[in-house]
Amino acid sequence: MEKLARQQIQALTPYLSARRIGGSGDVWLNANESPFNNEYKTDFARLNRYSDCQPKAMIQAYANYAGVQPEQVLTSRGADEGIELLIRAFCEPNQDVILFCPPTYGMYAISAETFGVERKKVPLTTDWQLDLPSIEANLDRVKLVFVCSPNNPTGNLVKRADIIKLLEMTQDRAIVVMDEAYIDFCPEASTVDLLAQYPNLAILRTLSKAFALAGLRCGFTLANAELINVLLKVIAPYPVPVPVAEIAVQALSPAGLARAKYQVLDLGANRAYLQVGLSMVPGVQVFEGWGNYLLVKFPDGDALFKAAWEHGIILRNSPIENCVRISVGNREECEKTVAFIRNYYQ
């Protein structure tokens, strides 16, 4: 049957998510999931009826949280669907181009390839910042520029001044898509305040990380109302299951927000524990991170990754040479990981 698929799909290498890679262990620090398993109440009523395309209570709750108007919010099945919607809505196949800056999240390229949209890569600088002159030189036919901050997998923040310069250089030419999946761990670095000034800005958000709802598959796109209305033309008619909307509203309630804030602080302490503990291991370099993960460079990254895997500690290998991404888990998971790595290098 594969021969019946589009040629681009036949040649496509799918994104290897943490779940697809698999593994077996008792310490799972490979998918940037939260270690907190929070409880929610839903009576599963009205399941015989379709949900609203954009549930009003859910949209209003996230608008209040993000500090925008409801008409500036679109919800989707995770931020990944937001990526696809932007590409489908704004890029002509075999004509338009997306631009992204590796090393970064892999789904920008795969989503574009799936829809027959060309990809341009402008690598980040040696300190993992935007190479603005090279981006400007490559803007021909580009409709979307994807920027991840905090960046996955490096963990760093992209300079705000550079984001503004990028928005300026792409005005009336392209949309800058800020992937803020991890911004809840450093909300002061958000670009949401720039929406009022730049109609070519779109922001991707998710409840998967700081809100500990990866299994809910609930994401948001923030933008000006005109851009949101374009996305509403291509989104599925019933993208949000009723229980998802109900749980999201609870997570965004005052009590839910207070809990998320506390858990973010707890993860920040565990991240600091990981950073200090691993930095004391000879030959190991820990890069500063602003999300719920750290990028760590080892003398032999692939070997360390495999040894941890065999020991039941599941980490995430990286396209960056000798680097491994380690999610921030609970304190016990962090302690086990640091102890294993210390013993490995003794």
UniProtKB/Swiss-Prot annotation:
Gene Ontology MF annotations: histidinol-phosphate transaminase activity; pyridoxal phosphate binding
Annotated SUPFAM superfamilies: PLP-dependent transferases
Classification via Pfam families: Aminotran_1_2 (PF00155)
GO biological process: L-histidine biosynthetic process
This protein's UniProt keywords: Amino-acid biosynthesis, Aminotransferase, Histidine biosynthesis, Pyridoxal phosphate, Transferase
Pathway: Amino-acid biosynthesis; L-histidine biosynthesis; L-histidine from 5-phospho-alpha-D-ribose 1-diphosphate: step 7/9
EC number assigned by the record: 2.6.1.9
InterPro entries cross-referenced by the UniProt entry: Aminotrans_II_pyridoxalP_BS, Aminotransferase_I/II_large, HisP_aminotrans, PyrdxlP-dep_Trfase, PyrdxlP-dep_Trfase_major, PyrdxlP-dep_Trfase_small
Superkingdom, natural source: Bacteria
Enzyme class per UniProt: transferase
Reactions listed under catalytic activity: L-histidinol phosphate + 2-oxoglutarate = 3-(imidazol-4-yl)-2-oxopropyl phosphate + L-glutamate
Cofactor: pyridoxal 5'-phosphate
Keyword Transmembrane: no
Chain positions found as N6-(pyridoxal phosphate)lysine: 209
Record text on subunit structure and interactions: Homodimer.
Family: Belongs to the class-II pyridoxal-phosphate-dependent aminotransferase family. Histidinol-phosphate aminotransferase subfamily.
Protein name: Histidinol-phosphate aminotransferase
Species of provenance: Vibrio cholerae serotype O1 (strain ATCC 39315 / El Tor Inaba N16961)
Phylogenetic placement of the source organism: Bacteria, Pseudomonadati, Pseudomonadota, Gammaproteobacteria, Vibrionales
Gene that specifies this protein: hisC
